[in-house]
C-alpha cells in the first residue's frame, strides 16, 4: 500500500485544483524554493491523515483556506488516492480515495465519495498499520532539531508512546475511578448496616404487644365485614328491583321515541316533498317567463314578417303594372325604330348615288385641274430652264419624288382598306359575343332563382330546429333546478354526516382523496390508486335494525381505510406528509391482517355480527378484524353469559355492550345521529343525483347537442348558398357590364366607319392626280424645250378649261343635293341612336331589374315563415296555459302537504311531552339508583379496606343480627383502645429491615470482590506496561545501534534507560490523583515492577567506535545531534513500520557524507515502504525514483513531475525556476 496520487484545491497556497502525477511506490523527492509550497503539500497530507488537525475551530479552518488575489475561496479539499493492491486497507478495491473537505462551517470526510466520520477514518488507518502511538511516519521541518535537543525525559515519553502505554494508562485511570466509586459504596453500606442492627433490636421488644393487638383487631375486622356485607346485599336487592323498573320504563321510552322518530321521518318526507314541489313551481314559473319572453319575440318576428309579406305583395303588384307599361313602351320604340330604319333605308341609296356621282365629279375635276396645271407648268418650264438637259434632270427628280409619294398614298389606302375590313370582322365577332353573353345571362338568372328558393327552405328548417332547441333548453333548465335541489339535499345529508364524525377523521378522509387526486392528475402510482378501497363504512351494507349495534361495535373503525397492502398505505402516507396535509388516518392493509376463524356458539339467542353484513369477499379479512369477535344477543343477560363463556364481545340491538374482559357499556343511543343511517341516506341521494345527471346527459343534452349540430350544419349550408348567390349575382353583373361594353364598342365602330370611307376616297383621288402628273412628266421627258405650248396642247388646255367649268357647276349641284340627303340621314340616325335605341336599352334594363320571378320566391318563403311563426306562437300559448294549470295544481298539493305537516307536528309534540314525563320519572329512578350505587361502592370500599381476612371471618358471625354484631363490635373497640400506643407496623418493619440487612450484606460482598478484581487488573496493567516499555526499549535500542552503524560506519551508539536512585519497589504505588489503598486491598505487590522507576532515555554515541570516546547528546555538535536524531527516528520506524513516510528537509543540518548515508538508508528502506521527501541537497536525489518540482507564481503553488536533471538544477540554483 502507498500514496498513489494527491489532489489539492483551495488549501493554503494551492488555490486551483492541483492533481499531482502518480507517485512512485519507492522514493519520491520534492524540490522547490523556500516558500514555494513544499511544506504546505506535506501539511495537506498530514491534514487528511494526522490527529493534529482533528479538532479545528472556525478561525483555524479559515486559516487553512487559500488567501490571494481574485475571489475568496470558501471551501477547500485534499484527496489522497491509495494504491491498495496488497489489500492492506480492508476494502476490496485496488484504489481507495480518502478526501477531507473544510469550509467556514463544515469539516467532512469522504471515503470513495461516501461521507464517513473521523473515527471511521482513524480506525481504517490503524487497520492498515498507522499507529496512533507512533506519529513519526510524518516528520515535519524542525522535528529533527527538536528531537536532537530534547531532554532524556522527553525521549522516555516518546518511547512510552511507541510502546503504546497510553492504552494502559487510560485503562488504569478507568480502574482508579471505579475503585473510588466502589469505596464510597462500601462506606454507605457499612453505615446502613449499623442503623438496621439498631432498629431490629428495638422492633423485637414491640412484637409481643403487637400480637395481642392483632387478635382483637382480627375480630373487629370480621365483625365489620359481616355488617358491611349485610348492607351490601340489601343494597343489591334494591338495585335489582330498580333495574327491572328502569327496563320497563326504558322499553316504553323506546316505543315513544320510535313513534316520535316516525313522526319526524314523516315530517322530513313532507318537507322534502314540499321543497321538491316548490322547486317544481319555481321551474315552471321560470319556464313561463321564458315562454312569455319567447312569445313576445315571436310576435315581433310575426309582425315583421307580415309587414315584409305586404311590402313584397305591393312590390309585386307595382312591378306587374310597371312591366306592362315598359313592355308597351318597348313595343312603340321598336315600331318607331323600324319606321326610322325604313326611312333611312329609302334615303341611303339616293345619298349613296349622289355621293358616288359627286366623288366621280370631284375626282374628274381634280384630274382635269391637275392636267391643266401640268400643261401650264410645261409652258412655264421654257422660261424656267435654259436647256433641255436641265429640264430633263429636274423632271427625273420630280418623277422620283412622285413615285415615292404615290407609294406612300398606296400604303395609306391599303391600311385604310385593312382597317375597314377589320372593323367589319370585329362587328360580326362583337355580335356573336353579345348573343353568347345574353344566353349566359339567362342561365345565371335561373341559377340565382333556384338558390333563393333553396336558401329559404334551409332557413325555415333552421327556424324549426331553433324552436325545438328552445323547448329542450326549457326542459334542461327544469332538470337543472331539480338537480340543484337534489344536490342541496345531498350536501345537507353530507353535512349531517360530517357533524356526526370527528374533525380529524374528516380531514384525514379529505386529505387521502387529495393524495389520490394528485396521483391521478400526475398519472403516477396506478397500483396505489387501484389498491385503495375507501373507508370501512362505504364497503358494506346491513339491515337498518342492526345499524345501532354495528355502529357501536365499530366506533371510529368505520372510518378506517382499506388498502391491499402496507406498501400502498406507505406510499399514500409519504405523499400525505410531503403535501403537509391535516387529519388522522388509520389503514387496514389486507396483506398484514392476521385473522383466524372463530368458533361461534350455537344458540338461538345470539348470532355473529359479521353474518349480517354484506360486503365484497376480498375484504373478508378487514371485516373479520373489525366485527369477527362480536355477537348480537337478544338481551343483556344473554350478552353477559356468552361474553363470560366464550370470551367474545357481545352487544344487543339497542347498543348495550358486554366486553369479553367484563366491562359493560350502554344507555340511550340517538338513532337520529346514526352514521350508518346518514351514510345510507347520502349514498341513496348520490345514486338519485347520478341518475338525474345521467338522464340529463343521456337525453336532453344529447338531443340539444344533436340539434346544435344540425343547426350548425344548416347555418353552414345557408352560408354556402349565400356565397353561391353572391358569386352568381356578381357573375350576372359582370355579364351585363360586358354586354354593355360590347354594345358601346359596336356603336363606336359604326361611328368611325363613314369618316374612314371618305378618307379613302380622298386618298384615291389624290393618287389619280399624282399618277396623271407622273404620266405628263414622263411624256415631256426628252421633248424639245419650248417657251410656248404646242397647238395641240393649247387646244387641250382650252378643252380642259371648258370641262373644269362644267364639272364645277355639276359638283356644286351634287354637293347641295348630298348635303340635303346627308342631313336627313344624320337626323334620322341621331334620333335612332341617341333617342330611340338608348331609351330601348333603358327599358330593357328596367325590365331585367324587375325580376318578377325572384320577388315571387321571396314572397313564398316569407309566407311559409309566417305560417311557421304563427304555429310556434300558438304552441307557446298552449304550453303557457298548461303551466298555469300545473302551477295551480302543485300549489294545491303544497297546501295539502302543509296541513299534513301540522298534524304530524302535533303528534310529534304529544310524543315529546310523553317522553319528557317519562324522562323525569327515569331521572328520579336514576338519582335513587345513583344513591344506592354510591352506598354499594362505600360498602365494597369498606370491605376492601378491611384487608385480607381469615376464612372463618366470612362464616363465624353470619347468624347474628345487626344489633348483636354492633354490640360485639363495641366490645372489640374498647379492648383495642388499650393498645392504642402499639406500633401497628412493628412486625412488617422487622421483616422489612431483616430483608434489607440480607441484601446489603450480599451487596457488600459483591463490592469486595469487585475491589479485589480491580486491584488485580491494575497490577496486570502495570506489569504489561512495564514489559511493553522494556520490550520496545530493547527493539529500539538494537535498531538504533544498527542504524547508527550504517549511517556512521565504524561508529557506535547505545540507548541507556535511566532510573531513580535508591528506588525500591514495594508493591503497587497509587499516587495518581491522590488515591490510596483501601482497607480491603490486596496488600503489597512486590513482584510487580513500576514504570515510575524510569526517569529518561539517554543516548551515548561514539563516531570513532572507541569505547572511551562515548559521549552524551549535550557533548555533540549540531550536525551530529541531527544524525543521532535521524538514527533514532529510523530505529523507531523499524520497530513500528508504516506503509509510507513523509520527511520534510530531514537532511538540513547534515554534512554531505552523512546526507549520503541517510540517502542510502532511505534507498534500503524504500524496498518495503514508500518515501516522500523534500530536500535542498543533491544527495537525496541519487536514491530517488521520481522527482517533483514546486513553483510559486502569483501567490499560488503548482507541483509538477520533473526530471532528475531539473531536480538537480532546483537544488543547485533554485532561482532559475523561481
Curated annotation (Swiss-Prot):
<dbReference type="GO" id="GO:0007064">
    <property type="term" value="P:mitotic sister chromatid cohesion"/>
</dbReference>
<feature type="compositionally biased region" description="Basic and acidic residues">
    <location>
        <begin position="1067"/>
        <end position="1080"/>
    </location>
</feature>
<keyword id="KW-0547">Nucleotide-binding</keyword>
<dbReference type="GO" id="GO:0000775">
    <property type="term" value="C:chromosome, centromeric region"/>
</dbReference>
<feature type="coiled-coil region">
    <location>
        <begin position="393"/>
        <end position="503"/>
    </location>
</feature>
<feature type="region of interest" description="Disordered">
    <location>
        <begin position="242"/>
        <end position="268"/>
    </location>
</feature>
<keyword id="KW-0132">Cell division</keyword>
<protein>
    <recommendedName>
        <fullName>Structural maintenance of chromosomes protein 3</fullName>
    </recommendedName>
</protein>
<comment type="similarity">
    <text>Belongs to the SMC family. SMC3 subfamily.</text>
</comment>
<keyword id="KW-0539">Nucleus</keyword>
<comment type="subunit">
    <text>Forms a heterodimer with SMC1A or SMC1B in cohesin complexes. Cohesin complexes are composed of the SMC1 (SMC1A or meiosis-specific SMC1B) and SMC3 heterodimer attached via their SMC hinge domain, RAD21 which link them, and one STAG protein (STAG1, STAG2 or STAG3), which interacts with RAD21. Also found in meiosis-specific cohesin complexes. Found in a complex with SMC1A, CDCA5 and RAD21, PDS5A/SCC-112 and PDS5B/APRIN. Interacts with MXI1, MXD3 and MXD4.</text>
</comment>
<keyword id="KW-0158">Chromosome</keyword>
<dbReference type="GO" id="GO:0003690">
    <property type="term" value="F:double-stranded DNA binding"/>
</dbReference>
<keyword id="KW-0007">Acetylation</keyword>
<dbReference type="GO" id="GO:0006281">
    <property type="term" value="P:DNA repair"/>
</dbReference>
<feature type="modified residue" description="N6-acetyllysine">
    <location>
        <position position="105"/>
    </location>
</feature>
<dbReference type="InterPro" id="IPR024704">
    <property type="entry name" value="SMC"/>
</dbReference>
<dbReference type="Pfam" id="PF06470">
    <property type="entry name" value="SMC_hinge"/>
</dbReference>
<keyword id="KW-0227">DNA damage</keyword>
<keyword id="KW-0469">Meiosis</keyword>
<feature type="modified residue" description="Phosphothreonine">
    <location>
        <position position="783"/>
    </location>
</feature>
<feature type="modified residue" description="Phosphoserine">
    <location>
        <position position="886"/>
    </location>
</feature>
<dbReference type="GO" id="GO:0030893">
    <property type="term" value="C:meiotic cohesin complex"/>
</dbReference>
<dbReference type="GO" id="GO:0097431">
    <property type="term" value="C:mitotic spindle pole"/>
</dbReference>
<keyword id="KW-0832">Ubl conjugation</keyword>
<keyword id="KW-0067">ATP-binding</keyword>
<dbReference type="Pfam" id="PF02463">
    <property type="entry name" value="SMC_N"/>
</dbReference>
<dbReference type="InterPro" id="IPR027417">
    <property type="entry name" value="P-loop_NTPase"/>
</dbReference>
<keyword id="KW-0175">Coiled coil</keyword>
<dbReference type="GO" id="GO:0051301">
    <property type="term" value="P:cell division"/>
</dbReference>
<feature type="coiled-coil region">
    <location>
        <begin position="669"/>
        <end position="916"/>
    </location>
</feature>
<feature type="coiled-coil region">
    <location>
        <begin position="179"/>
        <end position="350"/>
    </location>
</feature>
<feature type="modified residue" description="N6-acetyllysine">
    <location>
        <position position="140"/>
    </location>
</feature>
<feature type="domain" description="SMC hinge">
    <location>
        <begin position="530"/>
        <end position="642"/>
    </location>
</feature>
<dbReference type="InterPro" id="IPR003395">
    <property type="entry name" value="RecF/RecN/SMC_N"/>
</dbReference>
<dbReference type="GO" id="GO:0005524">
    <property type="term" value="F:ATP binding"/>
</dbReference>
<keyword id="KW-0234">DNA repair</keyword>
<dbReference type="GO" id="GO:0030892">
    <property type="term" value="C:mitotic cohesin complex"/>
</dbReference>
<dbReference type="GO" id="GO:0016887">
    <property type="term" value="F:ATP hydrolysis activity"/>
</dbReference>
<dbReference type="GO" id="GO:0016363">
    <property type="term" value="C:nuclear matrix"/>
</dbReference>
<dbReference type="InterPro" id="IPR036277">
    <property type="entry name" value="SMC_hinge_sf"/>
</dbReference>
<feature type="modified residue" description="Phosphoserine">
    <location>
        <position position="1013"/>
    </location>
</feature>
Amino acid at each position: 500500500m502507498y500514496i498513489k496520487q494527491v489532489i489539492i484545491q483551495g488549501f493554503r497556497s494551492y488555490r486551483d485544483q492541483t492533481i499531482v502525477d502518480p507517485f512512485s511506490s519507492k522514493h519520491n523527492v520534492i524540490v522547490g524554493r523556500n516558500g514555494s509550497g513544499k511544506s504546505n503539500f506535506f501539511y495537506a497530507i498530514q491534514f487528511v491523515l494526522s490527529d493534529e488537525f482533528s479538532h479545528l475551530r472556525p478561525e483555524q479552518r479559515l486559516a487553512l483556506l487559500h488567501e490571494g488575489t481574485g475571489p475568496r475561496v470558501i471551501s477547500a479539499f485534499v484527496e489522497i488516492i491509495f494504491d491498495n493492491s496488497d489489500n492492506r486497507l480492508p476494502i476490496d478495491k485496488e484504489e481507495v480515495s480518502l478526501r477531507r473537505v473544510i469550509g467556514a462551517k463544515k469539516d467532512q470526510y469522504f471515503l470513495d465519495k461516501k461521507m464517513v466520520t473521523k473515527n471511521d477514518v482513524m480506525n481504517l488507518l490503524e487497520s492498515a498499520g498507522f499507529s496512533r502511538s507512533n506519529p513519526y511516519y510524518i516528520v515535519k521541518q524542525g522535528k529533527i532539531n527538536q528531537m536532537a535537543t530534547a531532554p532524556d525525559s522527553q525521549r522516555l515519553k516518546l518511547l512510552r508512546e511507541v510502546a503504546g502505554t497510553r492504552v494502559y494508562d487510560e485503562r488504569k485511570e478507568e480502574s482508579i475511578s471505579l475503585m473510588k466509586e466502589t469505596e464510597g459504596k462500601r462506606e454507605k453500606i457499612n453505615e446502613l448496616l449499623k442503623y438496621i442492627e439498631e432498629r431490629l433490636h428495638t422492633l423485637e421488644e414491640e412484637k409481643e404487644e403487637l400480637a395481642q393487638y392483632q387478635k382483637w383487631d382480627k375480630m373487629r375486622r370480621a365483625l365489620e365485614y359481616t355488617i358491611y356485607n349485610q348492607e351490601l346485599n340489601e343494597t343489591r336487592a334494591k338495585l335489582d328491583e330498580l333495574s327491572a323498573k328502569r327496563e320497563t320504563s326504558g322499553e316504553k321510552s323506546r316505543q315513544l321515541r320510535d313513534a316520535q322518530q316516525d313522526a319526524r321521518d314523516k315530517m322530513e318526507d313532507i318537507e322534502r316533498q314540499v321543497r321538491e314541489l316548490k322547486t317544481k313551481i319555481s321551474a315552471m314559473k321560470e319556464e313561463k317567463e321564458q315562454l312569455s319572453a319567447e312569445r313576445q319575440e315571436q310576435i315581433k318576428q310575426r309582425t315583421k314578417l307580415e309587414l315584409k309579406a305586404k311590402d313584397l305583395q305591393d312590390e309585386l303588384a307595382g312591378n306587374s303594372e310597371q312591366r306592362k307599361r315598359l313592355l308597351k313602351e318597348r313595343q312603340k320604340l321598336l315600331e318607331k325604330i323600324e319606321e326610322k330604319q325604313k326611312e333611312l333605308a329609302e334615303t341611303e341609296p339616293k345619298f349613296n348615288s349622289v355621293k358616288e356621282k359627286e366623288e366621280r365629279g370631284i375626282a374628274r375635276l381634280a384630274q382635269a385641274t391637275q392636267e391643266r396645271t401640268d400643261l401650264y407648268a410645261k409652258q412655264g418650264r421654257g422660261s424656267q430652264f435654259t436647256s433641255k438637259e436641265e429640264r430633263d434632270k429636274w423632271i427625273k427628280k420630280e418623277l422620283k419624288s412622285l413615285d415615292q409619294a404615290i407609294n406612300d398614298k398606296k400604303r395609306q389606302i391599303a391600311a385604310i382598306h385593312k382597317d375597314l375590313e377589320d372593323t367589319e370582322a370585329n362587328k360580326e365577332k362583337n355580335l356573336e359575343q353579345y348573343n353568347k353573353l345574353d344566353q349566359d345571362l339567362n342561365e345565371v338568372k335561373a341559377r340565382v332563382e333556384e338558390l333563393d328558393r333553396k336558401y329559404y327552405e334551409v332557413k325555415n328548417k333552421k327556424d324549426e330546429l331553433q324552436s325545438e332547441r328552445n323547448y329542450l333548453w326549457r326542459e334542461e333548465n327544469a332538470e337543472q333546478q331539480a338537480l340543484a335541489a337534489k344536490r342541496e339535499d345531498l350536501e345537507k345529508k353530507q353535512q349531517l354526516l360530517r357533524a356526526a364524525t370527528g374533525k380529524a377523521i374528516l380531514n384525514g378522509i379529505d386529505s387521502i382523496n387529495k393524495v389520490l387526486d394528485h396521483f391521478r392528475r400526475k398519472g403516477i402510482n396506478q397500483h396505489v390508486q387501484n389498491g385503495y378501497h375507501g373507508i370501512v363504512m362505504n364497503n358494506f351494507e346491513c339491515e337498518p335494525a342492526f345499524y345501532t349495534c354495528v355502529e357501536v361495535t365499530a366506533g371510529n373503525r368505520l372510518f378506517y381505510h382499506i388498502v391491499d397492502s402496507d406498501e400502498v398505505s406507505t406510499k399514500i402516507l409519504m405523499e400525505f406528509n410531503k403535501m403537509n396535509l391535516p387529519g388522522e388516518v388509520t389503514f387496514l392493509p389486507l396483506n398484514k391482517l392476521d385473522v383466524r376463524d372463530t368458533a361461534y356458539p350455537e344458540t338461538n339467542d345470539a348470532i355473529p355480527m359479521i353474518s349480517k353484513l354484506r360486503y365484497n369477499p376480498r375484504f373478508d379479512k378487514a371485516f373479520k378484524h373489525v366485527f369477527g369477535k362480536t355477537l348480537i344477543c337478544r338481551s343483556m343477560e344473554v350478552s353477559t353469559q356468552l361474553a363470560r363463556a366464550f370470551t367474545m364481545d357481545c352487544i344487543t340491538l339497542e347498543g348495550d355492550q358486554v366486553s369479553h374482559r367484563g366491562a359493560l357499556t350502554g344507555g340511550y343511543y340517538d338513532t337520529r345521529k346514526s352514521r350508518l343511517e346518514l351514510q345510507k341516506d347520502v349514498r341513496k341521494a348520490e345514486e338519485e343525483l347520478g341518475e338525474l345527471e345521467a338522464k340529463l346527459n343521456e337525453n336532453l343534452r344529447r338531443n340539444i347537442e344533436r340539434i346544435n349540430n344540425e343547426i350548425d350544419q344548416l347555418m353552414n349550408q345557408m352560408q354556402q348558398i349565400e356565397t353561391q348567390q353572391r358569386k352568381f349575382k356578381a357573375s350576372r353583373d359582370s355579364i351585363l357590364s360586358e354586354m354593355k361594353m360590347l354594345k358601346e364598342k359596336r356603336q363606336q365602330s359604326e361611328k368611325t366607319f363613314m369618316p374612314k370611307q371618305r378618307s379613302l376616297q380622298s386618298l384615291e383621288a389624290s393618287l389619280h392626280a399624282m399618277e396623271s402628273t407622273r404620266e405628263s412628266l414622263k411624256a415631256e421627258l426628252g421633248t424639245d424645250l419650248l417657251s410656248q405650248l404646242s397647238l395641240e396642247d393649247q387646244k387641250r388646255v382650252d378643252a380642259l378649261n371648258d370641262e373644269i367649268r362644267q364639272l364645277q357647276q355639276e359638283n356644286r349641284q351634287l354637293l347641295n343635293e348630298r348635303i340635303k340627303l346627308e342631313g336627313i340621314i344624320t337626323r334620322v340616325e341621331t334620333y335612332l341612336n341617341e333617342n330611340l335605341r338608348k331609351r330601348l336599352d333603358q327599358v330593357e334594363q328596367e325590365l331585367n331589374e324587375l325580376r318578377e320571378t325572384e320577388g315571387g320566391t321571396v314572397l313564398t318563403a316569407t309566407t311559409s315563415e309566417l305560417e311557421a311563426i304563427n304555429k310556434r306562437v300558438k304552441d307557446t300559448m298552449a304550453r303557457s296555459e298548461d303551466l298555469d294549470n300545473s302551477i295551480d295544481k302543485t300549489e294545491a298539493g303544497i297546501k295539502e302537504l302543509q296541513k299534513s305537516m301540522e298534524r304530524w307536528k302535533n303528534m310529534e309534540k304529544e310524543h315529546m311531552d310523553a317522553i319528557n314525563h317519562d324522562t323525569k320519572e327515569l331521572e328520579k329512578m336514576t338519582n335513587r339508583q345513583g344513591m344506592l350505587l354510591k352506598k354499594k361502592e362505600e360498602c365494597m370500599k369498606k370491605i376492601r379496606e378491611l384487608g385480607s381476612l381469615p376464612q372463618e371471618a366470612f362464616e363465624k358471625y353470619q347468624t347474628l343480627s345487626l344489633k348483636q354484631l354492633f354490640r360485639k363490635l363495641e366490645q372489640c373497640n374498647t379492648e383495642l383502645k388499650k393498645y392504642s400506643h402499639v406500633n401497628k407496623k412493628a412486625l412488617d418493619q422487622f421483616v422489612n429491615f431483616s430483608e434489607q440487612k440480607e441484601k446489603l450484606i450480599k451487596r457488600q460482598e459483591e463490592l469486595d470482590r469487585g475491589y479485589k478484581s480491580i486491584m488485580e487488573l491494575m497490577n496486570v496493567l502495570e506489569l504489561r506496561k512495564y514489559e511493553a516499555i522494556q520490550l520496545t526499549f530493547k527493539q529500539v535500542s538494537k535498531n538504533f545501534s544498527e542504524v547508527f552503524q550504517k549511517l556512521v560506519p565504524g561508529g557506535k551508539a547505545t540507548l541507556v534507560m535511566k532510573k531513580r536512585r535508591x528506588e525500591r519497589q514495594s508493591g503497587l504505588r497509587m499516587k495518581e490523583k491522590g488515591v490510596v489503598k483501601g482497607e480491603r486491598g490486596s496488600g503489597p505487590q512486590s513482584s510487580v515492577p513500576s514504570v515510575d522507576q524510569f526517569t529518561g532515555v539517554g543516548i551515548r554515541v561514539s563516531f570513532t567506535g572507541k569505547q572511551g570516546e562515548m559521549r552524551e547528546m549535550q557533548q555533540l555538535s549540531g550536525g551530529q545531534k541531527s544524525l543521532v536524531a535521524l538514527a533514532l527516528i529510523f530505529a523507531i520506524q523499524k520497530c513500528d513500520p508504516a506503509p509510507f513516510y513523509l520527511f520534510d528537509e530531514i537532511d538540513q543540518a547534515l554534512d554531505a557524507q552523512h546526507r549520503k548515508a541517510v540517502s542510502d538508508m532511505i534507498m534500503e528502506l524504500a524496498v518495503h515502504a514508500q518515501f516522500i521527501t523534500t530536500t535542498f541537497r543533491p544527495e537525496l536525489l541519487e536514491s530517488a525514483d521520481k522527482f517533483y518540482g514546486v513553483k510559486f507564481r502569483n501567490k499560488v503553488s503548482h507541483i509538477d513531475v520533473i526530471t532528475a536533471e531539473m531536480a538537480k538544477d532546483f537544488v543547485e540554483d533554485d532561482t532559475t525556476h523561481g
